[in-house]
C-alpha cells in the first residue's frame, strides 16, 4: 500500500470474465483499489453515485444503458470522477461520442494490462490517455473537418499556445503549472480560455487540435 490513499476504481462491463480479470490485476497495483463492479450502464451510474469512485473503467456496448449514456450521466452528477472507456473495437462514432460525453481516456480490451493501469493513473491525474490507434483516428478526423475555427477569429496568445502545446502532450493542469511556473488555478484558467477560443468541448479535443496544428508530434 502506498502512503497516499489508493485510486478508487469502479469497473462497468457486462462480461463477468472481463470484470474479474480487471479486478484481479488492478487490486494487485499498490496505488489502486477496485471498489465495485457493475454489469450495465444503469447499474454503473447507480454505483458511481453510491461509491464515489475516482476513476470508472467503462465498456461501451452494454444492455439496459450503453456506455456513452452512462458516461454522460456520471459526469453530470460527479464531474470530478474520471472515466476511461474500454472496448474491443475502434468505431469513429462511438469514440467521438464517448469523448464528447466526458471520457478522458480510451483503451482497447486487447491492450496490455499495464496500459490499462497507466490509463487509470493518467485519468486520475487529469491527463488524457488514448490508444495510439484512437488518437490517429481522431487526428485524421480533425484534419478532414472543415470549420470556421480552423482560421482563428480570436488568435491565441503566446502563453496560451504554450499551454496548448503541453495539453497536446497529455499534461494535467498541475503539470502544466509546474512546467510554466504558474499556479494550477492559473493553468486551469488558461485551459478554459483556450477551449472557448477554439470552440472545443474538452481537453482531449484540445490535445488533438495541438497535434493537428503541429504544436506537438502526431501519435505513432
Regions found by a protein language model. Name each.
Residues 40-43, 64-69:
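Acidic catalytic/metal-coordinating carboxylates
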Residues 77, 89-90, 185:
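Short, conserved "switch-loop" micro-motifs in signal-transduction and mechanochemical regulators
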Amino acid at each position: 500500500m502506498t502512503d497516499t490513499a489508493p485510486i478508487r476504481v469502479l469497473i462497468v462491463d457486462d462480461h463477468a470474465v472481463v470484470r474479474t480479470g480487471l479486478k484481479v490485476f488492478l487490486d494487485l497495483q499498490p496505488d489502486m483499489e477496485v471498489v465495485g463492479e457493475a454489469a450495465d450502464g444503469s447499474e454503473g451510474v447507480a454505483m458511481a453515485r453510491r461509491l464515489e469512485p475516482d476513476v470508472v473503467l467503462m465498456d461501451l456496448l452494454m444492455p439496459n444503458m450503453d456506455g456513452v449514456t452512462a458516461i454522460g450521466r456520471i459526469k453530470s452528477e460527479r464531474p470530478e470522477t474520471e472515466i476511461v472507456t474500454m472496448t474491443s473495437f475502434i468505431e469513429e462514432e462511438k469514440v467521438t461520442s464517448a469523448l464528447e460525453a466526458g471520457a478522458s481516456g480510451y483503451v482497447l480490451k486487447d491492450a496490455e494490462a499495464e496500459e490499462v493501469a497507466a490509463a487509470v493513473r493518467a485519468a486520475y491525474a487529469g491527463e488524457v490517455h488514448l490508444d495510439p490507434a484512437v488518437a490517429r483516428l481522431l487526428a485524421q478526423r480533425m484534419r478532414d473537418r472543415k470549420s470556421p475555427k480552423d482560421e482563428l477569429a480570436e488568435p491565441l496568445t503566446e502563453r496560451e499556445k504554450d499551454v496548448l502545446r503541453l495539453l497536446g502532450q497529455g499534461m494535467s493542469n498541475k503539470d502544466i503549472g509546474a512546467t510554466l511556473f504558474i499556479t494550477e488555478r492559473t493553468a486551469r484558467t488558461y485551459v478554459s480560455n483556450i477551449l472557448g477560443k477554439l470552440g472545443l468541448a474538452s481537453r482531449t479535443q484540445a490535445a488533438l487540435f495541438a497535434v493537428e496544428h503541429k504544436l506537438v508530434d502526431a501519435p505513432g
